[in-house]
Amino acid sequence: MEIYLVRHTETVCEKGICYGQSDVGLAEPFELIFENIISQLPSEAIIFSSPLQRCVILAKYIQNKIKTISYQEDERLMEMNFGDWEMKNWNDIPPEQLNPWMEDFVNICAFNGESFVELHKRTGTFLSEQISKKTDKPIVIITHAGIIRSFLCHHTSLPLKDAFQNKADFGQVIKIDF
């Protein structure tokens, strides 16, 4: 099964802002980048998207261009929940909270947030469901950097602590086979 992992394009957030599950918009103009993304995708596919607008805008654009009947939003494709850190500048997060997370982001979470291992479990559930369907159509997943890194860890058996070795740039398309 072919899976295309697509990271949303740049957001309106200033650099240095923690915006995991906050529903922030996309920086404009984005149409040229969207066209570049589409050029890397199959002409027919099943499309899934995070329900956050920075992914949904791209999903709708792709749906219209490649004439896919529909796309499906799935909350398991949302970025990591950073809890009380959402929409704060990383530099404004107290070191006594941030440092332990930086040392072990896999198991430690922001207050009222989730850990990477929790995120990884939900991506694993999503992935298992798709694999069990045994579809012959490619799957396009429009999502976020944390989710892409998690999928790549599932795909390569890379330890979660090394997830940041997986590159996930804005607007990047990564094709994997399961």
Predicted regions and their residues:
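Residue-level preference for the first positions of well-ordered beta-strands
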Residues: 3, 136-142, 173
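GST superfamily/GST-like fold recognition
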Residues: 145-149, 172-174
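Short beta-strand scaffold positions
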Residues: 49-50, 121, 142-143
